[in-house]
């Protein structure tokens, strides 16, 4: 295609590729969604696999709470991927319409419909509770002694023996084999979402030139933001939540890390739970076996190997003696010790499961909304079409509206920067990056509160990109602001020419109040007073800060956010 619709470089991103990325992301969203639904289908096979006792009940409660929150975080991540898928199609359509407007003699452009995606968190079915395993508590111990003792008698003696000490408090024990199987069921979920995350990043790489530093950095930010990072994120609950993590290699993906690690650790804790159940079962069986051995020795049943009938007749007469002998030889101290070890391990595991909640809660706050990722994808796609050229090319219809003195396309401005190299050899003056979409579009009230918490500043956001562009356009259309902007731009051109240009220069624009709500804000004062109980306040205006671009000879919106006059 001809300039300005393409530029020099090793990768020439075309609208067709944006449609392909959009379609691929939609498929990956479905795969990410199915990874959890398939796991939950398997989980339904494991009802009533738990045991009795207060400690097993506590573990089951903690496990259920963690799984429920994991499902919530996973569902929000599904929605975020869908938003990204839609954003790439929107930009491809905007490009087609802009190209058609530039070349009216060409055949009319027909926009493609956005991909069918999940745009709100799915309602996943809760897995069945652990419950208490069905069956008689003593069934696991009826075969502890191969002495040919009749079933009813054996049951009577075993039950009486288990009543010594605390054994019956924890019976029936969990089905350790099924609990171990459930632990293994978590691992395919962890592997599956890992593969999908890799596919998703490969998809974005299709429209990324990693040899272009600004492009590469933007790609890393786009991918990491999909997994919950922000410009203000810090190291919280043991994870990096910033776009540019200060430690560790590569890109931070905290929400993905939480989902993956939680699955891995739940698998580990369930395996340890199963091992603890097996260990106490084995210990109690050994104690009973020893008691029966000693009881038979005391009773001198030397003819124990005779026929079943003779044995039955004889043991029947000795019921009271056998019971008394077993009870006499049961080691109550060892029984209680085995129970104590088991319950101590369960309490340890319960606390470990509870400890997973902090990262999950943070992840639930951090997952971006559908609206946020749609806007970010539009921005990344817009800039990729022109290889992150600093000469900005607006694409949306608003930028071509003759009623707008200054056309506006926030997506095409995102990541714009204006470093300046003075002609006299002074050091390079660092540019000011545009970040309206990344920091001020589609944030939830909880995300605004998290920003206040992390940065100690007021925080605000537009609900979506359309509202942001409407509010900013209103400010740009204000007649006084038009005069202010034109005067300011003329001065910037002169300063570029004489080498005195400062990238941070910005005109002081009038704040324009609209009838409609532009967004919401949470003040530091309110957060300091109420914490996460602070409520967002609706706003009807926006603060707009511009920056001048020497490369394009015009301005870009460095940032804009809802703010009361």
Residue ranges and their predicted role:
Residues 410-453:
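Extracytoplasmic/periplasm-facing segments of secreted or lipoprotein envelope proteins
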Residues 445-565:
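Functional cores of ribonucleases/endoribonucleases
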Residues 3-5, 317, 403, 421, ...:
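Compositionally biased, low-complexity repeat tracts
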Residues 148, 152, 214, 330-333, ...:
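Alpha-helix boundary/N-cap detector
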Residues 22, 183, 197, 216, ...:
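Extracytoplasmic/secreted envelope proteins and their assembly/folding machinery
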Residues 1-185, 189-427:
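Intrinsically disordered, low-complexity Pro/Gly/Thr/Ser/Ala-rich repeat tracts
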Residues 49-50, 320, 332, 406, ...:
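Feature targets compositionally biased, intrinsically disordered low-complexity regions
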């Amino acid at each position: 295609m001809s300039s300005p619709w393409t530029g020099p470089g090793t990768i020439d991103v075309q609208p067709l590729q944006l449609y392909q990325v959009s379609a691929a992301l939609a498929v990956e969203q479905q795969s990410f969604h199915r990874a959890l639904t398939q796991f939950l289908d398997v989980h339904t096979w494991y009802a009533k696999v738990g045991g009795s006792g207060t400690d097993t009940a506590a573990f089951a409660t903690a496990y259920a709470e963690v799984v429920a929150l994991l499902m919530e975080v996973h569902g929000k991540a599904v929605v975020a991927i869908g938003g990204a898928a839609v954003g790439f199609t929107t930009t491809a359509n905007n490009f087609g319409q802009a190209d058609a407007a530039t070349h009216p003699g060409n055949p009319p452009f027909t926009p493609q419909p956005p991909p069918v995606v999940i745009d709100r968190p799915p309602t996943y079915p809760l897995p069945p509770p652990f419950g208490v395993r069905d069956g008689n508590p003593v069934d696991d111990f009826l075969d502890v002694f191969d002495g040919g003792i009749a079933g009813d008698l054996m049951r009577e003696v075993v039950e009486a023996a288990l009543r010594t000490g605390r054994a019956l408090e924890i019976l029936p024990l969990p089905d350790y084999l099924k609990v171990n199987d459930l632990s293994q069921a978590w691992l395919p979920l962890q592997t599956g979402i890992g593969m999908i995350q890799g596919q998703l990043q490969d998809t974005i790489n299709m429209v990324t030139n990693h040899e272009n530093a600004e492009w590469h950095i933007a790609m890393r930010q786009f991918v990491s933001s999909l997994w919950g990072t922000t410009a203000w994120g810090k190291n919280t609950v043991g994870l990096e939540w910033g776009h540019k993590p200060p430690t560790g290699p590569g890109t931070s993906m905290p929400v993905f890390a939480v989902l993956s690690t939680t699955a891995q650790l739940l698998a580990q804790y369930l395996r340890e739970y199963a091992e603890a159940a097996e260990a106490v079962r084995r210990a109690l069986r050994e104690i009973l076996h020893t008691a029966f051995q000693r009881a038979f020795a005391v009773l001198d049943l030397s003819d124990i190997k005779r026929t079943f009938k003779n044995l039955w007749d004889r043991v029947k007469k000795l019921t009271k003696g056998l019971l008394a002998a077993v009870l006499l030889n049961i080691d109550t101290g060892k029984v209680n010790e085995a129970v104590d070890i088991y319950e101590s391990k369960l309490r340890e595991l319960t606390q470990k499961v509870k400890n997973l909640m902090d990262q999950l809660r943070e992840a639930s706050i951090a997952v971006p909304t559908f609206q946020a990722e749609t806007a970010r994808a539009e921005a990344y796609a817009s800039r990729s079409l022109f290889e992150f050229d600093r000469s900005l090319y607006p694409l949306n219809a608003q930028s071509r509206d003759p009623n707008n003195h200054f056309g506006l396309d926030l997506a095409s401005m995102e990541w714009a920067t204006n470093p300046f190299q003075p002609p006299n050899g002074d050091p390079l003056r660092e540019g000011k990056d545009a970040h309206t979409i990344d920091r001020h579009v589609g944030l939830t009230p909880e995300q605004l509160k998290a920003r206040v918490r992390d940065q100690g500043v007021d925080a605000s956001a537009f609900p979506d990109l359309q509202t942001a562009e409407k509010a900013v356009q209103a400010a740009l259309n204000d007649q006084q602001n038009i005069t202010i902007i034109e005067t300011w731009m003329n001065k910037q051109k002169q300063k570029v020419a004489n080498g005195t240009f400062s990238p941070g220069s910005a005109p002081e624009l009038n704040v324009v109040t609209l009838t409609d709500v532009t967004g919401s804000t949470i003040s530091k004062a309110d957060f300091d007073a109420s914490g996460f109980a602070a409520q967002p306040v609706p706003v009807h205006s926006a603060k707009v800060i511009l920056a001048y671009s020497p490369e394009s000879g015009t301005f870009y919106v460095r940032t804009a956010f809802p703010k009361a006059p």
